[in-house]
Each structure stands twice: as structure tokens, then as C-alpha cells.
Regions:
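Conserved SAM/AdoMet-binding glycine-rich loop
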Residues: 40-121
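Canonical Radical SAM [4Fe-4S] cluster-binding loop centered on the CxxxCxxC motif
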Residues: 1-29
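Conserved alpha-helical substructure of the radical SAM core
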Residues: 18-47
Length: 121
């Protein structure tokens, strides 16, 4: 489930900002509605996607960052596992790391996860 399109980082090796443009965040309400619909249809795992997924900031709720979004998804009945792809180490907050310990539905760090840290960024 895409929550962010584009990127604002402009890493020297990366074409994403030039090909996909600046970051555009989906509204929190739209994401949560899509998660609820997926859970109601029997989907038990939600994977959040974005060029830098953990840089999420809801355009429709100034208090909703990536941690708050994951917490809201965690509270949706039917969701058993939450995964995310392409986080950037710079955007991991202490609050999110604490949420990873506290919320059992958040999948742990996986070797398949694509991260700039793995690409020597």
C-alpha cells in the first residue's frame, strides 16, 4: 500500500527525485480506509510502501507522522502484521523504535527490507 510517492533526498547516486518528483504523501484518512477495506476483505498483512516510507507526514493531520500512522493501523481489527519497505535510517525516531518493541503487529527488521543503509547511502 503506497503511502508516499517521490523523494526529496537527492542522493548523488539516485534518480528517484528526478523521475518521480518531490514527495507527495497520501492523506491519513485515505490510507486508513484502504487498510480497513483490505482487512474486511481478509487481508491480514499490510505492507506500507514509499521511497522513504518512514518520512511520512499526513497532509490531512498535522499530528500524524509515520509512527502515528502505524499505531492507527495497528488498532484496526483484522490486521495481524504490518510491514514497511524502504525506510531511511535518518528518519527512524526513538518513538518509532519504541513502538516497534511495544506493538506486536509490527514486523521486525527483515533482511529483505530495502534500505539506504544497505546501499551505503
Amino acid at each position: 500500500m503506497t503511502i508516499i510517492e517521490g523523494c526529496n533526498e537527492f542522493c548523488s547516486f539516485c534518480v528517484v527525485p528526478y523521475t518521480r518528483g518531490n514527495e507527495r504523501m497520501r492523506p491519513k484518512a485515505d490510507i486508513l480506509a484502504e487498510v480497513r477495506a483490505a482487512a474486511d476483505s481478509g487481508h491480514r498483512e499490510i505492507q506500507l510502501l514509499g521511497q522513504i516510507v518512514n518520512h511520512y507526514a499526513a497532509p490531512d493531520d498535522s499530528t500524524c507522522d509515520f509512527t502515528a500512522l502505524v499505531e492507527a493501523i495497528h488498532d484496526i481489527d483484522g490486521v495481524e502484521r504490518i510491514r514497511f519497505a524502504s525506510p531511511h535510517p535518518r528518519h527512524f525516531s526513538v518513538r518509532f523504535l519504541e513502538a516497534m518493541q511495544r506493538l506486536p503487529k509490527i514486523a521486525g527488521i527483515c533482511t529483505s527490507r530495502c534500505s539506504p543503509a544497505r546501499r551505503a547511502c
